Structures are given as C-alpha cells and as structure tokens.
Design a protein with these regions (language model features):
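Phosphate/pyrophosphate- and phosphate-bearing ligand-binding catalytic cores of soluble enzymes
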Residues: 85-173
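Short, low-complexity, polar/charged sequence segments that are solvent-exposed and flexible
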Residues: 10, 27-31, 46-50, 69-73, ...
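Glycine-rich loops and low-complexity Gly/Arg-rich segments
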Residues: 13-18, 36, 53-56, 76-79, ...
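Structural signature of FAD isoalloxazine-binding scaffolds in flavoprotein oxidoreductases
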Residues: 1-17, 65-95, 109-116
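A gly/ser-rich beta-alpha-beta helix-loop segment of oxidoreductase catalytic cores
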Residues: 44-45, 49-80, 150, 156
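N-terminal short leaders/motifs
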Residues: 33-40, 63, 68-70, 106
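Anion-binding (especially nucleotide phosphate/pyrophosphate-binding) glycine-rich loop
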Residues: 1-60
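Short, well-ordered alpha-helical segments in soluble proteins
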Residues: 42, 60, 64-68, 83-86, ...
Length: 173
C-alpha cells in the first residue's frame, strides 16, 4: 500500500477499450481507448473532426477529464455525451451541453469514473482527413520532441495573460 496517496486508483482496460460506429457520423468509444486509435478509427470511417486526436498521447477518459486539445481543437468540440459512474455506483449519461468546458478542464466531478463517450464527426474525404493528420503530425514534430520519451506537456498556456505559448515564454526568459 502507498502511504502517500489517500485514495483509490482504478485502471480501466480491456472492457473499456472498444470503439464502434453508431451511425454514419457518431462514434462510441470506451474511456480506455487511446486518443490516436480513435482518430485512426474515424479516418477509416471517413469522419473528420478527430484529426487533432492523432497528436494527443493519452486515453479518451483522460482527454475528457482535462478537455485535452491541440491545434485549436479540444474534446469539447466533438463530444456528444459521456457515460460515467458516480461514487454511489449510479451510471449516468451527461450530455456535453450540460458540461462547462474551459481551457484544459471542465466542471465534472472528480468523483466520476468515465466509462465511455459518444462523439460526432463530419463525413469527409479519406485523403483530406489523412492529409490533415499528417500535417498536424509534422507541425507537432517541428515544435515538440516526438522521437524521445517525455512526460508530455506539463504547462498550461497562460491564455488569459498572453497569446504566446508557454514554451516561447520559457525560451525567451
């Protein structure tokens, strides 16, 4: 037991690692699905709007928790609803319109365990979607180390104070 952490760690795995197409523009994803895997599934089904996920390391559940995003897109832009369990064990579905999203956070209780989510894409051209994913990957490679293991981004951009990205502010200091 870890005496430094007063809580429970839950790892959702195999049973929460499924993706399915509900109809021509809606995807349902388990919370353990890797963000990039969801973007590739959307590509195979000619759905645009998920391209940015190809550049985000992490899972769907984590992405929803922090409203992860990059290149001007965030989870809130594609989320229809999230299915969760509250601390009493009740399963609930929360429509995205009932969630207050902000930069890298939302107002959902930290006690919720996200199980799955539904997302809406837009029918698109496979080649254009793939090209956009490639373009975003190249842009990320120019601005971030992608060939070595890192802890990822540890800073939030101070959007209320400046238009500059935090890495630029650090470099300039």
């Amino acid at each position: 037991p870890d005496k430094l952490f007063d809580g429970v760690v839950i790892k959702l795995s195999k049973n929460f690692n499924n993706i399915s197409l509900l109809n021509e523009d809606i995807i349902i994803s388990g919370s353990a699905v890797i963000d990039k895997t969801l973007s590739e599934f959307a590509l195979k089904n000619n759905l645009s709007g998920f391209e940015f996920l190809s550049c985000i390391p992490g899972t769907i559940g984590g992405g929803i928790r922090m409203n992860a995003g990059c290149f001007g897109r965030e989870f809130k832009d594609i989320l229809i609803s999230v299915q969760a369990i509250d601390k009493s064990g009740n399963m609930i579905t929360i429509p995205s319109k009932d969630i207050k999203f902000e930069y890298r956070k939302n107002d959902l209780s930290g006690d919720f365990i996200f199980l799955s989510a539904s997302f809406r894409g837009k029918k698109g051209d496979y080649a254009k979607i793939k090209n956009e994913m490639h373009k975003l990957k190249k842009e990320k490679e120019i601005n971030q180390p992608t060939k070595i293991k890192t802890s990822g981004s540890t800073f939030k951009n101070p959007i209320s104070q400046t238009e500059k990205k935090v890495w630029k502010l650090i470099k300039e200091s």
